Amino acid sequence: MSPRLIFATGNQHKLEELRRALPGMDIRALGRDDPPPEDGATFEDNARIKARFARAHADVDVWAVGEDSGIEAAALDGRPGVHTARWAAGDPVGRMLAALDGVTDRAARYVCVIVAVGPEGEEVVARGTLAGSIALSAAGDEGFGFDPVFVPEGESATVAVLGDAWKRTHSHRARAARALAEALPT
């Protein structure tokens, strides 16, 4: 039997993406309006903060899950990184395109870290990355965030063009979710 997961997120897109990546697991949102501050120095730090927060507010028999993710652009020295959500507020695509205007090195990667804290305080850390580059202009209607400008390695279209079916299998979050599923006890 798969463990039940309580996911500390208010982001419906992330919740649905995790559910699609782990179809056999019972995944529910924590359902709180007072998230902890994301003041960690790394994606793992922030994911752990959220997982521990969820653990403190969840039923005793579930795994509490926190996730942090973002995009790192090589030409921006890895920024926005852990500050992706704040950096991208409003118009993430426009801000990224403006930041890389005239820049030839458009290498970037999506990063996702998921931390799960079990009923006894045991911890599982799962990571997923998706390397690629930032396109010169936006294309596509599916996805969210930077998907309209992110072209994965080996592909010629943005994630927003490739679509949800592609993303369900190949995204940084899907990769981290699979690593989590492999690491959790059954």
Feature map (PLM): residue ranges:
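Anionic-ligand binding patches
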Residues: 2-6, 12-186
